[in-house]
């Protein structure tokens, strides 16, 4: 049985909590720092939500992680994202209310796709797959599907467009696709660089210990 599916029911609660927090806390901080400003500005970073859920899927599957810890990670980030949105709505009013429309629940499958994209990448890496190529493929597929889900739901269900039709939707689809996929990719590149840096440092420490 692979490490991704081994039972961990006997694992001490303190270990489960530590396993959860070491993964959840950095991602939650990134979500808190960027989600309130969905498009970014000169003073605010662009929204990192898509990258956060992709990275969460990766890190909550990377290594031996209990299934309960994974579920808590996903639903904890969903709850945090919803809380940020509703607080933003309360503080800023009408503009944010456009996002809290009948299309809003479709963010759940959109983020779920990103989560499973990251989880697939973790499995590929642990199976010895080529990291860079697998990462690009995972993000390209998961990011595109997530965009289609969230964009289509917002266009057809939000009520923002009085007379929606296919031609206009396709035009808007292509207009925002590049930004949707590339902006989170910048966060993913930064995360990959940090991951490789810490992995290299850890290997160096282990080599020093084994040499002593």
Regions found by a protein language model. Give the residues of each.
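Hydrophobic transmembrane alpha-helices
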Residues: 2-75
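Membrane-embedded alpha-helical hairpins and interfacial helices in multi-pass inner-membrane proteins
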Residues: 120, 124-204, 211
């Amino acid at each position: 049985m692979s490490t991704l599916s081994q039972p961990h029911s006997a694992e001490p609660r303190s270990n489960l909590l530590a396993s959860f927090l070491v993964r959840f806390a950095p991602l939650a901080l990134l979500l808190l720092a960027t989600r309130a400003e969905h498009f970014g500005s000169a003073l605010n970073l662009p929204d990192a939500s898509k990258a956060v859920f992709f990275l969460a899927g990766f890190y909550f599957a990377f290594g031996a992680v209990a299934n309960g810890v994974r579920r808590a990670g996903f639903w904890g980030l969903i709850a945090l994202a919803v809380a940020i949105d509703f607080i933003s709505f309360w503080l800023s009013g009408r503009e944010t209310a456009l996002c809290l429309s009948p299309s809003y629940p479709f963010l759940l499958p959109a983020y779920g796709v990103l989560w499973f994209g990251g989880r697939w990448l973790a499995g590929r890496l642990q199976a010895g797959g080529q990291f860079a190529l697998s990462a690009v493929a995972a993000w390209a597929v998961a990011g595109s599907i997530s965009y289609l889900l969230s964009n289509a739901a917002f266009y057809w269900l939000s009520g923002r467009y009085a007379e929606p039709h296919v031609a206009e939707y396709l035009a808007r689809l292509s207009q925002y696709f590049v930004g949707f996929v590339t902006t989170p990719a910048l966060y993913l590149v930064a995360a990959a660089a940090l991951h490789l840096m810490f992995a290299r440092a850890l290997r160096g420490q282990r080599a020093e210990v084994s040499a002593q």
